Structures are given as structure tokens and as C-alpha cells.
């Protein structure tokens, strides 16, 4: 019996679906991570036309909670094939929930193409459990127009300590009526402060709170930023990005990937400048540089 045109199309679609190779990925930030996933899918499809990447946007806190829930329930069917992780969570999660991760050491991936610093985040006991995704060099992006309104220049914010930054930031807050910094509501900025001084909240795989001068100083700085209205904290990612795009904050300290979200506000073109982050006061080895990927 000869098939109708509609039946033939349905058959072809079913056959195509059977041949599809689909992987699911969880990630956040449509301007950077989601965009990169779409580009990766398109590149891979050139040689694998039946491949499809099911990209599901989830904020990182939701991803981590889903990982914990699945691990504690012993039900991994709810998890995707691929998920993005914050650098600073990798060692903790591999140690606590090793069954979630697939060892990639002998996968055929040439890990020599990646920098040692980034590989260290996803390497545990000499074994690879992830693939570096971005460089994430920390930047402080500031609104040059808001800074100038306070009688300051972008140069004033370069190579500062946190105490110096606080005094400058107060002037910007007073002149513009908005916080100097916006934050994504996590521990990222505290981790970046620690990294900038070559410090960590961990030692030998355990949390080190006692005799950790850098951690104490970082928490003091964070508290001052919030208490004095210099920084506003958002737990919602969209609100965090909107605070930059709508001029509700004069700056942000984040991995350099945040620039794609800043650039989404085309009406602010030419009004942003990049400097390095402040260094912790009175901490040996403190610098103005860190990483957040």
C-alpha cells in the first residue's frame, strides 16, 4: 500500500529520531555558557549530523543541589550526561560523591592542551574527572561614567588594597546612589579573595578555619562590603545580571566571562572599564589577581 505524503513524512521523522545521538547538559549564563554549548553543538554536528545537545539552563546552586539529592538517594537517572561546575566545588564534590563522576584520564582527551592551573581544579589524586571549560581570570569591571561622577578616574581603582578600595567605593556610592559592586550571592568573591593571597579554606582535604588569617580577613572584608552598602548580594542570577545592565550597581568582581553579560546592554557601550581586583590588607603574599571559572 502506498503511503500518503503525511505518512511518509512521519516515517522519515521517526527514522531520523531513531538515529539521533542526544546528550543532555546542564549549564547557566545564556550569554556565555549556554552560547558556548550551542557553538560546540554546531561544530560537532558538521561531522556528526545526527548529534543533538539538549541544553538545559539551570543556575549553579540548583545544579549542585540536584547532584547532592541524586547522590544521597542513589538515583542517578535524574542527572544529565554533562554538567558545568564551579572550579572551587570540584574537589569537594568528587570527595563526597565520587559515584557521580566519570574518570576521564584514559578517555583519549589530550589534557596537555590545558594549563596546569585549570587542570588542578578537576584533577584528584592524579586522575581527571572533568574538562576545563574557561580561563576565568578575575576582573573588576567598573562603570567609568559613575566613577567620574564621583570625581575619580578608572586609574584610581588599579592595584588597590581592599581598604583603599572601600574609601573610593564610598564616594561612588554617595555620588550615584547605587552600590559599587553587585554579587551573585555565593561564596565566589570570598574564594577569589583567598586565591588572590594564595590561600584556601581547605588544608589536606579538610576545612581549615583556625589560624587561617586570609580567610578571617576575607570574611571581614565581605561583611564590611555588605554592612556599608558597598556591595549588594543577589541569589537570583537574572537579577544579578540585571543589576549591571540596568545601572543598579557601578561594578562587579567576577571571572572575565562576565563581560559577555555586560556587553548585552548595548546602551552602555563605552561606559565600562576593566581593572584588577583589590588585594587583602596585611596578608603575606596578597596580590590583585585571582581566578573564577
Tell where the protein language model's regions lie, with residue ranges.
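Beta->alpha turn/N-cap motifs
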Residues: 30, 84-89, 186-187, 237, ...
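Helix-loop-helix "hinge/cap" segment bordering the ligand-binding cleft or interdomain interface
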Residues: 46, 52, 122-188, 200-235
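Short, low-complexity disordered leader/linker segments with a strong preference
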Residues: 1-24, 46
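Extracytoplasmic ligand-binding clamshell segments of periplasmic binding protein
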Residues: 61-65, 199-265, 269-271, 275-277
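Short, well-ordered beta-strand elements
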Residues: 18-30, 51-56, 81-82, 129, ...
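Hinge/lid segment of periplasmic solute-binding proteins
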Residues: 16, 84-139, 166-168, 197, ...
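Extracytoplasmic/periplasmic substrate-recognition and gating elements
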Residues: 46-47, 52, 73, 224, ...
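Extracytoplasmic "Venus flytrap"/periplasmic binding protein-like
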Residues: 43, 47-114, 149-151, 250-251, ...
Amino acid at each position: 500500500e502506498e503511503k500518503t505524503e503525511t505518512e511518509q513524512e512521519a516515517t522519515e521523522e521517526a527514522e531520523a529520531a531513531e538515529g539521533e545521538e542526544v546528550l543532555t547538559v546542564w549549564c547557566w549564563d545564556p550569554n556565555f555558557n549556554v552560547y558556548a554549548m550551542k557553538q560546540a553543538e554546531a561544530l560537532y554536528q558538521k561531522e556528526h549530523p545526527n548529534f543533538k545537545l539538549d541544553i538545559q539552563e539551570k543556575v549553579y546552586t540548583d545544579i549542585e543541589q540536584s547532584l547532592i539529592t541524586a547522590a544521597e538517594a542513589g538515583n542517578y537517572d535524574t542527572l544529565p550526561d554533562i554538567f558545568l561546575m564551579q572550579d572551587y566545588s570540584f574537589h569537594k564534590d568528587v570527595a563526597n560523591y565520587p559515584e557521580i563522576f566519570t574518570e576521564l584520564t584514559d578517555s583519549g582527551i589530550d589534557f596537555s592542551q590545558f594549563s596546569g592551573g585549570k587542570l588542578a581544579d578537576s584533577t584528584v589524586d592524579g586522575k581527571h574527572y572533568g574538562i576545563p571549560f574557561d580561563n576565568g581570570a578575575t576582573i573588576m569591571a567598573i562603570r567609568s561614567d559613575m566613577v567620574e561622577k564621583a570625581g575619580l578616574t578608572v586609574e584610581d581603582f588599579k592595584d588597590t588594597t581592599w581598604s583603599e578600595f572601600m574609601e573610593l567605593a564610598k564616594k561612588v556610592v554617595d555620588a550615584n546612589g547605587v552600590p559599587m559592586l553587585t554579587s551573585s550571592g555565593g561564596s565566589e568573591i570570598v574564594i577569589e579573595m583567598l586565591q588572590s593571597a594564595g590561600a584556601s579554606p581547605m588544608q589536606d582535604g579538610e576545612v581549615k578555619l583556625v589560624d587561617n588569617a586570609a580567610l578571617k580577613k576575607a570574611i571581614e572584608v565581605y561583611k564590611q562590603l555588605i554592612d556599608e552598602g558597598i556591595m549588594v548580594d543577589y541569589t537570583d542570577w537574572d537579577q544579578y545580571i540585571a543589576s549591571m545592565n540596568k545601572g543598579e550597581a557601578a561594578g562587579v568582581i567576577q571571572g572575565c566571562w562576565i563581560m559577555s553579560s555586560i556587553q548585552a546592554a548595548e546602551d552602555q557601550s563605552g561606559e565600562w572599564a576593566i581593572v584588577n581586583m583589590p588585594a587583602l590588607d596585611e596578608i603575606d603574599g596578597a596580590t590583585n589577581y585571582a581566578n573564577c571559572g
